[in-house]
From Swiss-Prot:
Protein name from the UniProt record: Telomere length regulation protein clk-2
Family stated for the protein in its record: Belongs to the TEL2 family.
Classification via InterPro entries: TEL2_C_sf, TEL2_Regulation, Telomere_length_regulation_dom
Subcellular location: Nucleus; Chromosome, Telomere
Domain of life: Eukaryota
Source lineage: Eukaryota, Metazoa, Ecdysozoa, Nematoda, Chromadorea
The gene coding this protein: clk-2
Species annotation: Caenorhabditis elegans
Region of interest (Disordered), ranges: 488-509
Biological function: DNA damage checkpoint protein required for DNA damage-induced cell cycle arrest and apoptosis, thereby playing a role in genome stability. Regulator of telomere length.
């Protein structure tokens, strides 16, 4: 019988202690003891006290291989953190305590022991591959355990375990690299990087490569920490360079894509040429490194100025011919018509900075065909002349810079007397402050490179652009057509009278020209205002979708922009296929033309997309919880979902009139009476109802007499109601359930720094729940909402606690009494009652929290009084 079977079948403490003693005495036989103990902890855990968990298990951990223990903990943490697993939080916290013990004692030594592995030992190589994968996955799996936490203290302890693991991981990698450096120095001879003469560095390289994005601190990841440590090393000799080659330039078993991501991240986080030179020192560009520095970084990313300088300097330092190729490719792409039309402003600035810095580096190089580059750039200038001023300004400047180089090269090769201009002249698009700053930056890059003392910050360009007004018409006043016609009216009449006889060649006088009154009516335009060109609004959603990309003609853009909401509300053919793309495009749409009521219209379009296509809400929720999104954008997206739910759950005005008319014809109660009886349920006596007191006495008497003398057919049956479909209830699986995001894994931050976002999610989910009304799905929706909000009732965040109270209040208010009694048993209701009392007596509770709790407690009390009056005799009501 294996160890796990023995642990599962153990029914007495003595048998269990004997098993632990056998494992401790013969660790080689039970080399998988950690995995067996973790998998069967929910079976034998009931026989051990909290202190025995430590006294009985920790001696076993000391006898086991720490490398295998780390791998086993990584596997078992995945199982115990899921909801379907019956493991209690006591078992989870115990397992985390064991992990913490092993990490503090043996993680550093386990990483260092990987240096002694021989590549010919297949089993050892496979073991340490699994170990590297476990080290990169454990922080995320520890975060998943927060889903089973019962209080804020538990979450803090889980974060402490994760922090201890990260710190020991960094220390272990650094110590292993120091030991490897000493081994390389003493190894003789060191014939190959992975040979028997030197240490085995693949495990360290795999940990750094796969765990490069592990957050060590709030700002820096694992790779950033390692780069800073490498940059601080003294006596960086050839042995260190060999190790850097093994870590950064040799691909691991994880594949080329991971290696490519590692190199890309390395360039993006490098702060200087010296640090990058320590990490990557190459004599040629081949394979993955060539693709990263020649394609991915320069043409698939928008880089900061410092990163552009580091990248180009690296290519220039490695091989000058590749830098020339990079310049030619940049000019070719920049001159392409399709690129010019689709490139945003940030991408345009990025590629212009690259071209100008490359021209700065090669300003004295004669091996470049400057004339060919100049001729290619002419296409880029022509295609930018009808675009925004920044594009025109960049095109003219790049063309002038290449023209200067071509002229200088031509004068040297052909002996021409033509001299290039010493400085580039400002063009007419430099009149604005933004244009001046951009011109100064381009001039500085071309003349001095990326010198921080001379280059203007691009952030300053964006800030200044928002401050500058768009009215640049000047003080000169132009007469409109109507004014010009009025001023010339008298002179034209006098001239016609004086020359009347000269205008006739057949002895007949021409009559005076009379201007019609309709032609005298003109609209006086404001100073600087241009007459608007009318464009027919698009009739198809696909055409409107494409017209939103218009960057030159504002009338085309506005024709689609202001008409697309009407198109969406008609549910056109083809809209389901492009709804999600349209939502994303609208979300990131920029007001390039200064369109009035731009933000309000964007909000209307986004809400219409969700209303007519609720299937996109799961994608919107994924966008909300995605890392890197600003809190304002997340709140904006939640606002869209909330407004769409209001529109889908509300009754249409025309439909409401139709329903009321039908109910009046069939003699049933009107909609207003139904709502009145539903809302005002606190008055047992009809005369005490304040709404009834507003009706005059004579009107009530007349209504009573008419009702007594009116014959109705089928009065014993409930009057039929006109069918009103709640679209929100039908779309609950798209509008409600995706909002219940499980705070685990990548979303574990919802329990910490993003707890405000979790509160907003619960609030919006409860509002959607209320808008769905009493529908067939109300059973499951009520249970899901309560289950989702219950674990956060005692959170440290006041907003999150208030959101949980509101969710419970909405459920108790919306659910009919008999249905609520069926879904929630008496112990659950008593628990709610006690929770409400604890909130009211808590001094740290906010006033809003107490107000909502009073309403919630009143609702629970009324339900107990009606359905379980005996329970209240034992409660302090």
């Amino acid at each position: 019988m294996n160890l796990r079977s023995r642990l599962v079948n153990a029914t007495e403490r003595a048998v269990l202690f004997q098993i632990f003693k056998d494992v401790q005495n013969d660790p080689e036989k039970y080399d998988n003891a950690v995995e067996a103990i973790c998998e069967s902890i929910d079976y034998f855990g009931k026989f051990l006290t909290d202190s025995e968990y430590l006294t009985q298990i920790k001696p076993i951990l000391d006898t086991q291989c720490p490398t295998k223990s780390i791998i086993c903990f990584s596997k078992c943490l995945t199982k115990v953190s899921t909801d379907i697993n019956t493991t209690t939080f006591r078992d989870v916290i115990t397992m985390l305590d064991w992990l913490k013990y092993v990490v503090e004692k043996s993680l550093t030594s386990a990483i260092c022991s990987s240096l002694k592995v021989k590549e010919t030992d297949v089993s050892a190589v496979q073991l340490y591959r699994e170990f590297a994968s476990a080290c990169s996955n454990i922080p995320e799996k520890v975060s998943n355990c927060c889903a089973k936490a019962l209080s804020g203290e538990h979450v803090k302890y889980i974060n402490t375990v994760k922090w201890i693991f990260k710190m020991n991981l960094v220390q272990g990698i650094q110590k292993a690299m120091l030991l490897a450096h000493d081994d390389i120095v003493t190894a003789a001879p060191f014939t190959s990087f992975y040979g028997s003469g030197g240490p085995y560095m693949k495990t360290v390289a795999e940990i750094i490569s796969s765990g490069r994005n592990i957050d060590i601190t709030n700002k820096d990841g694992l790779l950033v920490q390692m780069i800073e440590w490498i940059g601080s090393l003294n006596n960086f000799d050839s042995q260190w360079r060999r190790m850097m080659f093994l870590i950064f330039q040799e691909p691991t078993y994880q594949g080329i894509q991971v290696h490519e991501s590692l190199l890309t991240t390395l360039f993006l986080i490098s702060k200087s040429d010296q640090i990058l030179k320590r990490c990557i020192e190459a004599t040629d560009l081949t394979g993955t490194l060539k693709r990263v520095v020649m394609v991915k970084l320069p043409f698939q990313r928008v880089l900061k100025r410092k990163t552009i300088e580091i990248l180009i300097n690296f290519v220039y330092r490695t091989k000058e011919q590749f830098a020339i190729q990079l310049l030619e490719t940049s000019v070719k792409i920049w001159s392409d018509l399709n690129y010019a039309k689709s490139a945003p402003e940030s991408q345009e600035r990025h590629i212009v900075r690259m071209i100008l810095y490359l021209v700065h580096l090669f300003r004295t190089c004669s091996s470049i065909d400057w004339e060919s580059l100049f001729l290619n750039s002419m296409d880029g200038v022509h295609c930018r002349m009808s675009m925004l001023p920044m594009y025109v300004q960049s095109g003219i400047f790049v063309n002038q810079a290449l023209c200067k180089q071509a002229t200088k090269h031509r004068s040297k090769t052909h002996g021409s007397d033509e001299q290039p201009p010493e400085t580039l002249e400002e063009n007419k698009f430099v009149s604005s402050e933004v244009g001046k700053i951009w011109f100064e930056e381009m001039t500085s890059i071309l003349e001095h490179g990326f010198n921080s003392s001379t280059v203007k910050d691009s952030e300053r360009v964006r800030e200044t652009a928002n401050e500058i007004t768009k009215d640049d018409s000047g003080e000169e006043f132009e007469e409109t057509n109507a004014q010009r016609l009025q001023n010339n009216k008298d002179s034209a009449a006098i001239t016609s009278k004086n020359n009347l006889r000269l205008d006739s060649d057949d002895d007949e006088d021409f009559p005076d020209y009379q201007v019609n009154e309709s032609e005298k009516i003109f609209k006086n335009l404001e100073i600087g205002e241009e007459p608007k060109n009318k464009v027919t609004p698009p009739a198809y959603i696909a055409d409107a979708f494409e017209m939103l990309l218009e960057k030159e003609k504002y009338e085309v853009f506005e024709a689609a922009f202001f008409n697309i909401t009407n198109l969406i509300n008609r549910r056109p053919i083809g809209f389901p296929q492009i709804a999600e793309k349209l939502f994303i495009r609208i979300l990131h749409l920029q007001n390039n033309f200064g369109t009035p009521k731009f933000k309000e219209t964007v909000d209307e379009i986004a809400v219409a997309c969700i209303t007519q296509r609720p299937e996109i809400v799961p994608s919107v929720v994924r966008l909300i919880i995605a890392p890197g999104q600003g809190f304002s954008i997340k709140q904006r997206l939640l606002h869209y979902i909330h407004n769409a739910a209001d529109g889908m759950g509300a009754l249409d005005k025309k439909l409401e009139e139709c329903v009321m008319a039908q109910q009046l014809r069939i003699g049933g109660p009107t909609l207003s009476i139904i709502l009145h009886r539903t809302i005002n349920t606190d008055y047992d006596d009809e005369d005490e109802d304040p709404h009834r007191l507003l009706v005059p006495e004579w009107r009530r008497m007349v209504d009573a007499r008419i009702a007594a003398n009116t014959r109705r057919i089928g009065t014993t049956r409930e009057p039929p109601r006109a069918g009103v479909v709640n679209r929100l209830a039908q779309a609950a699986k798209y509008m409600f359930y995706p909002l219940l995001v499980l705070p685990r894994g990548e979303n574990a931050s919802l329990l910490g720094k993003d707890s405000d976002l979790l509160a907003s999610l619960i609030m919006v989910a409860s509002m959607v729940y209320v808008r769905c009304g009493v529908c067939p799905q109300i059973h499951r929706m009520s249970s899901e909402l309560i289950s989702y909000a219950t674990p956060h009732r005692f959170s440290e965040n006041a907003k999150l606690r208030t959101a949980c109270i509101i969710a419970h209040l909405n459920v108790t208010t919306l659910l009919p009494g008999d249905l609520m009694d069926e879904l929630f048993d008496v112990p659950a209701l008593i628990g709610w009652f006690d929770w409400a009392n604890s909130v009211l007596v808590n001094a740290s509770s906010s006033q809003l929290e107490k107000d909502m709790t009073r309403q919630f407690g009143h609702s629970v009390t009324k339900h107990l009084q009606r359905y379980h009056p005996a329970v209240l005799q034992h409660q302090d009501v």
